[in-house]
């Protein structure tokens, strides 16, 4: 396993946010973390990235305690992209991607041919060749996310953590970004991402971890986790689940509400 979490507990000002969280992330898989707003998804990702520290429990990366890694050493093994990262003013796409090589720099290891090769390769794999000399601020939502993902690729970490990479994107750009993330796992990287769209999660993720009220409500193969019962329970709403022709991916259809009550089918 690339990442193992054992009985993790985190509280904020005496209020429990995450309780007794345990799971493992297999190497080379795309694993999604889903759940309603405020359930602790983003907090969990910050704990796994080393941005925050849990009060109890253990996180292991490649068999070693996460806390044992020095900052740059951890960045060479694990890349973390927060939700809505801030672009530095006036930066070009190529310069943004170059930031991914920072963990590999040092007093005796300055910018070299390998760094330039990794940046070019990352831009090509994220299909940025035609825009890499543009201002990053001028990019569309989908292009901007692909630029951030290229930076992650240039970092060349085996484990990638992404916090809601498709938030605030329309369905076209969501698909564009999820296809790009899928390509990353196809290259052998392990990706753990927080994602709100359950249908997208079930279509693209290998496995899902569903969190409700700070605990794991379900986990396993993505299309087995996304069930009517789970959605009713976690999101306090009623849905119907259809299946897409061809691959059978779930299509989630919320039931209409009238005067605060869910309209139930006659059956």
Which residues fall in each region the model found?
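The feature captures the beta-strand-to-loop junction immediately N-terminal to the Walker
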Residues: 34-36
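Helix-to-loop junction immediately C-terminal to a conserved catalytic motif
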Residues: 49
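Conserved ABC transporter NBD signature motif
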Residues: 57-65, 74
């Amino acid at each position: 396993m690339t990442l193992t979490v054992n009985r993790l507990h985190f509280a904020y000002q005496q209020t429990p946010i995450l309780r007794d969280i345990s799971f493992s992330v297999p190497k080379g898989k795309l694993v999604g973390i889903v759940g309603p707003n405020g359930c602790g998804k983003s907090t969990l990702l910050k704990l796994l990235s080393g941005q925050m520290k849990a009060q109890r429990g253990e996180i292991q990366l490649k068999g070693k305690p996460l806390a044992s890694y020095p900052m740059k050493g951890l960045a060479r093994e694990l890349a973390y992209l927060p939700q809505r990262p801030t672009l530095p003013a006036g930066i070009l796409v190529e310069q943004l991607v170059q930031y991914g090589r920072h963990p590999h720099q040092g007093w005796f290891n300055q910018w070299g041919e390998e760094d330039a090769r990794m940046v070019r390769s990352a831009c090509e794999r994220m299909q940025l060749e035609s825009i890499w000399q543009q201002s990053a601020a001028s990019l569309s939502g989908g292009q901007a996310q692909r630029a951030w993902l290229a930076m992650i690729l240039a970092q060349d970490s085996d484990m990638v953590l992404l916090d809601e990479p498709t938030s605030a994107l329309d369905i076209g750009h969501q698909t564009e970004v999820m296809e790009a993330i899928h390509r990353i796992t196809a290259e052998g990287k392990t990706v753990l991402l927080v994602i709100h769209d359950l249908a997208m999660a079930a279509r693209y993720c290998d496995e899902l971890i569903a969190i409700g009220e700070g605990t794991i409500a379900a986990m396993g193969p993505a299309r087995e986790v996304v069930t009517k019962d789970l959605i009713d329970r976690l999101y306090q709403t009623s849905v119907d689940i259809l299946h897409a022709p061809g691959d059978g991916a779930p299509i989630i259809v919320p039931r209409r509400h009238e005067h605060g009550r869910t309209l139930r089918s006659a059956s």
